[in-house]
């Protein structure tokens, strides 16, 4: 595989299969038959992850048949005290098939996540159209705490050190990328 110009891993031995990067229950969108599997490791409190979410939304609109996006949590607890709780809340939203709505609302309300009040997660659940009783039963009891940790450990094993980190068909690219950079990588992979 050709090396990308935007700081990717350069040797083919460092390619990681999608099977190792993602699990069947990870939030995903895009066709299963897509030529490109894009695995994202992200943190809901990371400003670069927030910036990237809007760019990736545009990318998926431009390449709806070519990219399957898979989301993995990588809460950077050392600097984002509510990132892990946000990831758990996202998993509870995914349980109701509303992950992407909740994902978008979390990023829209990112500054409120710095608050010491976990009620923001319940407000966002309501705003995203989740069943509040189901969400409370899930989030209030930490149902997905271990799953979030599994995502994090999968990221560590794959060499993720910060967010966002992307894997394009197994090739790692770190950091917030411009739409133009994303498109260059996608075009290279579609050749």
What are these regions (language model features)?
Residues 1-78, 137, 144-162, 185-191:
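Extracytoplasmic thiol/disulfide redox context detector
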Residues 2-5, 76-163, 167-191:
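Cysteine-centric redox/oxidoreductase cores and disulfide-bonded domains
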């Amino acid at each position: 595989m050709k090396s990308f110009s935007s700081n990717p891993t350069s040797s083919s031995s460092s390619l990681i299969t999608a099977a190792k990067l993602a699990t069947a229950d990870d939030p995903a969108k895009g066709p299963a038959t897509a030529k490109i599997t894009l695995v994202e490791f992200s943190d809901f409190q990371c400003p670069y992850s927030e910036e990237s979410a809007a760019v990736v939304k545009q990318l998926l609109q431009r390449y709806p048949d070519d990219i399957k996006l898979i989301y993995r949590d990588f809460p950077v607890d050392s600097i984002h005290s509510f990132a892990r709780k946000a990831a758990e809340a996202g998993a509870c939203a995914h349980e109701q098939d509303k992950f992407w709505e909740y994902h978008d609302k979390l990023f829209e309300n990112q500054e409120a996540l710095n608050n010491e009040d976990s009620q923001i997660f319940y407000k966002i659940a309501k705003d995203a159209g989740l069943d509040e009783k189901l969400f409370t039963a899930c989030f209030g009891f930490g149902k997905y705490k271990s799953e979030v940790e599994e995502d994090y450990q999968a990221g560590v094993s794959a060499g993720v050190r910060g967010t966002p980190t992307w894997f394009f068909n197994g090739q790692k690219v770190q950091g917030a990328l411009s739409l133009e950079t994303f498109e260059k990588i996608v075009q290279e992979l579609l050749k």
